[in-house]
């Protein structure tokens, strides 16, 4: 048994893991007891990592060799790496020569390692001469970046996880930490248990599990955070709870902010936010008068057209009360992805350069050009995520290179995103998993390595750099992301820099990291004192860690000096602006999207485990019970949900966690799991068919936390329910085969179930009984078409019932192996129970008679 220390590939907590492996198989995973981010703890996602890497799953879900399509929507053909890289470089050069470098677009990921990010950034900006490289971190963290830079001068969270243990007041806003950062939440729970006097305030439109631990819950209206923060500062000023000495010595711009918040009286704020003014007063008092206040925040602030203003307004509170630069205090942005921070460090966004340099700064461009050995870095701003896909949809960007992310699931306004990939002349998808929706749009698929196979580094929310180590070799012909980018770059150099030494002479991930390290010298994130060897010997470290240092830096700004031209933090007087898409009579509900506890992003990894669907088994939209009652919606009935951009059909579920006129749907449900067709027969996408592409003007982050929608009853009198246990060696192939069939119904969802075994559950609804051939295909695909199955068919009524029994375990009794009910699904509940609990089957005879 081999044991390899590495880092979890899920959220930004950055937990250490110990991977157990035998030969080329990962056999187990446990929390690393020595990693300071988690001290051995793991959440449900992290603790099941080894199961997602089982040989059966790898064979069915992974891209194992390069593949190319000769025509769109056609089958792929396996090709060699030499062929793949040759054709990729030729296509990029052709587009570049015909349309210029800005006709190229690179869309990368916060799940890439720092080394991967660095090479891609240098490839785009240094070699090809385009700043059109952005990342899915634009969807989660760019407002936090902009907020920190606007107020504190640098993209650097000033606090650390240990501050939870020192805080006297926790102010959690826009974060369901219990689900999105579970291991950190365990630390919060322990702090509350050890110190009952620790005050905890949670502000969130939903009464989440995190809110359940709060001493004070503020159920504010969606998008009103800036008004709340201005109102808190108004009260602090009125009551004399600010710190004038700190403001005078360490900040600037306070007078303009005082003028702005003068109008945000408790009455006005209570009205805007939908809160009790007494609760607003209490929150202000606890925040300001606590010896140490730590704020924790995430997508509720970031994913907004006011994202930068929200971040800045919260940081204003810390500056006004001196709650920064000391143990237990500070504005602490929780990173969404495992290496969104590392991507920011290397400048892997359209507006950034290496080591927190700004693309708009001529001095910074010159420094990076000198480091990379190029004449210049282009000054033309690059296209950010939403702009990039809109430009491709409009025909401006001709080639897209997508690495380690799934925009056909995760981007807002899916119709535009999919049109972009359809219209682009050339689409490359560099990906570990073959099952993502984006893979269907690729002209060229390049197999990449993933967790358990990669070497490099990541940086978590508290600026802590951890090593990622390989326990096994990548399967098939999969290659490391940085190496794929290097191989591409060297081919491009033969045409763009003939006869000159390569700019990409990297022999390992470490050699890439060393160049990145040098780029940080003298910068706010200086890591010139670090090395792979030091990280091996001393474990994960927090930056800055400059040359000559003996340890990292837990907290920033303890001396009151900030990385701004005058050394002072800057108050930001940003006005309150409502959500971009307000509710209106035609669209009377707010849609909020967010995470589930046991899933991650588009579920290309977590979605292969039936046990991770035990918490939330299938797609639903949640509504307040009173809103459902007014519309005569029944729990579990199908509704059509529509925004100005698209629609979907989904079951409705009552939730008292929500306020009136609010709805919630998990961000994970893409077209891989939730599908159907519209009135014109066009396929329906997942939840992001509904979401808004409107962005924050400063951060360019889209407002995924709010869209105006309508929810209507839909009459689909014909329904289908099918469930079947499937062999581990074929279950994911079966799911892939079912996906195109799902698009032939008005509504369909397909999800795995089971704990020790795995099966698939398919639900569908339609306006009329579909062609019997379609049901035959489903039966065949789920293994229910054998001669031994019990079966009843009534073609005139569009009804069918089928049950496959398994007697292999006990010849004297049988259990359900699978069933299909079409046209009449009244028996679904008890048959589902018999199947999932493996109760000895006693299927009533009338189930297979004409009713």
Q: Where are the language model's segments positioned?
A:
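N-terminal export/assembly segments and adjacent metallocofactor-ligating motifs
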Residues: 1-239, 250, 257, 268, ...
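N-terminal leader/propeptide and maturation segments of large enzyme subunits in energy/redox metabolism
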Residues: 72-77, 239-277, 354-367, 372-376, ...
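Conserved short loop/turn motifs at secondary-structure junctions
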Residues: 105-113, 272-275, 298-305, 337, ...
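Extended redox/cofactor-interaction regions of prokaryotic respiratory oxidoreductases
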Residues: 118-189, 196-203, 226-230, 318-440, ...
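Flexible glycine/proline-enriched surface loops and loop-helix/loop-strand junctions
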Residues: 170, 213-214, 264-267, 296-301, ...
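Short beta-alpha connecting loops at secondary-structure transitions
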Residues: 212-220, 447-449, 453, 464-475, ...
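Long, contiguous, secondary-structure-rich segments that constitute the structural scaffold
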Residues: 475, 481-538, 602, 606-622, ...
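Flexible, glycine-rich terminal cap/loop adjacent to redox cofactors
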Residues: 792-851
């Amino acid at each position: 048994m081999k044991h390899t220390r590495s880092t979890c590939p899920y959220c930004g907590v950055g937990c250490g893991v110990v991977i157990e492996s035998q030969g080329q198989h990962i056999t187990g995973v446990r929390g690393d007891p020595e990693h300071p981010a988690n001290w051995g703890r793991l959440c449900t996602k992290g603790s099941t990592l080894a199961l997602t890497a089982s040989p059966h799953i790898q064979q069915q879900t992974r891209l194992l060799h390069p593949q190319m399509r000769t025509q769109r929507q056609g089958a792929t053909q396996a090709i060699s790496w030499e062929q793949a890289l040759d054709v990729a470089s030729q296509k990029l050069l052709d587009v570049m020569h015909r349309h210029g470098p800005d006709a190229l677009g690179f869309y990368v990921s916060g799940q890439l390692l720092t080394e991967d990010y660095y090479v891609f950034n240098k490839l785009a900006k240094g070699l090809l001469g385009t700043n059109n490289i952005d990342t899915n971190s634009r969807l989660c963290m760019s407002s936090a970046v902009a907020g920190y830079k606007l107020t504190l001068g640098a993209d650097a969270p000033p606090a650390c996880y240990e501050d939870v243990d020192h805080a006297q007041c926790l102010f959690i806003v826009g974060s369901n930490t219990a689900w999105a950062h579970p291991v950190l939440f365990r630390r919060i729970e322990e702090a509350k248990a050890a110190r009952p006097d620790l005050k905890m305030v949670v502000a969130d439109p939903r009464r989440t599990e995190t809110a359940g631990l709060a001493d004070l819950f503020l159920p504010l209206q969606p998008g009103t955070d800036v008004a709340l923060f201005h109102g808190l500062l108004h009260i602090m000023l009125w009551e004399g709870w600010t710190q004038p000495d700190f403001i005078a010595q360490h900040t600037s711009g306070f007078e303009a902010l005082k003028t702005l918040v003068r109008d945000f009286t408790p009455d006005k704020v209570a009205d805007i936010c939908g809160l009790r003014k007494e609760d607003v007063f209490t929150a202000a008092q606890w925040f300001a008068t606590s010896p140490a206040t730590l704020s924790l925040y995430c997508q509720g602030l970031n994913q907004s057209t006011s994202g930068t203003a929200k971040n800045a307004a919260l940081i204003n509170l810390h500056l006004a009360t001196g709650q920064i630069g000391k143990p237990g205090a500070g504005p602490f942005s929780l990173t969404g992805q495992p290496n969104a921070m590392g991507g920011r460090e290397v400048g892997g966004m359209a507006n950034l350069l290496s080591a927190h340099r700004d693309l708009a700064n001529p001095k910074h461009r010159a420094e990076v050009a000198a480091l990379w050995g190029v004449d210049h870095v282009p000054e033309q701003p690059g296209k950010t995520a939403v702009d990039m896909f809109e430009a491709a949809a409009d025909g401006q960007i001709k080639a897209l290179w997508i690495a380690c992310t799934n925009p056909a699931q995760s981007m807002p306004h899916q119709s535009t995103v999919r049109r972009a990939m359809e219209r682009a002349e050339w689409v490359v998808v560099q990906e570990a998993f073959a099952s993502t929706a984006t893979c269907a749009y690729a002209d060229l698929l390049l197999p990449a390595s993933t967790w358990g196979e990669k070497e490099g580094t990541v940086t978590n929310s508290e600026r802590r750099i951890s090593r990622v180590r390989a326990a096994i070799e990548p399967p098939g012909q999969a290659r490391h992301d940085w190496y794929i980018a290097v191989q591409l770059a060297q081919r491009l150099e033969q045409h763009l820099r003939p006869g000159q030494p390569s700019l990409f002479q990297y022999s390992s991930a470490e050699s890439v990291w060393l160049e990145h390290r040098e780029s940080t010298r003298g910068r706010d994130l200086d890591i010139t004192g670090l090395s792979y060897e030091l990280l091996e010997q001393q474990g994960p470290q927090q930056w800055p860690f400059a040359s000559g240092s003996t340890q990292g830096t837990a907290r920033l700004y303890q001396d009151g000096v900030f990385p701004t031209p005058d050394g002072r933090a800057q108050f930001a007087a940003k006005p309150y602006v409502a959500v971009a898409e307000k509710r209106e009579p035609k669209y009377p509900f707010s849609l909020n999207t967010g995470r589930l506890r046991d899933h991650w992003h588009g579920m290309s990894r977590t979605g292969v485990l039936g046990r991770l669907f035990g918490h939330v088994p299938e797609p639903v939209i949640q509504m307040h019970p009173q809103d459902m009652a007014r519309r005569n919606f029944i729990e579990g009935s199908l509704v059509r949900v529509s925004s100005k951009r698209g629609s979907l059909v989904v079951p409705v579920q009552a939730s008292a966690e929500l306020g009136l006129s609010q709805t919630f749907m998990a961000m994970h449900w893409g077209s891989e799991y939730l599908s159907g067709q519209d009135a014109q027969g066009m396929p329906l996408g997942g939840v992001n068919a509904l979401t808004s592409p409107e962005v924050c003007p400063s951060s360019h982050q889209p407002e995924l936390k709010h869209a105006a929608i309508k929810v209507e009853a839909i009459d689909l009198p014909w329904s289908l329910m099918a469930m079947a246990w499937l062999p581990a060696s074929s279950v994911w192939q079966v799911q892939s085969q079912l996906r195109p069939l799902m698009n032939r119904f008005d509504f369909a969802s397909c999800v795995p179930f089971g704990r020790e075994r795995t099966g698939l559950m398919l639900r569908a609804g339609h306006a009329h009984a579909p062609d019997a051939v379609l049901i035959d295909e489903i039966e065949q695909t789920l293994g229910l078409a054998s001669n031994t199955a019990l079966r009843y068919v009534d073609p005139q009524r569009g009804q069918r019932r089928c049950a496959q029994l398994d007697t292999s375990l006990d010849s004297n009794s049988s259990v359900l192996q699978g069933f299909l009910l079409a046209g009449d699904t009244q028996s679904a509940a008890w048959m589902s129970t018999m199947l999932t609990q493996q109760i000895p089957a006693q299927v009533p005879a009338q189930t297979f008679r004409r009713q």
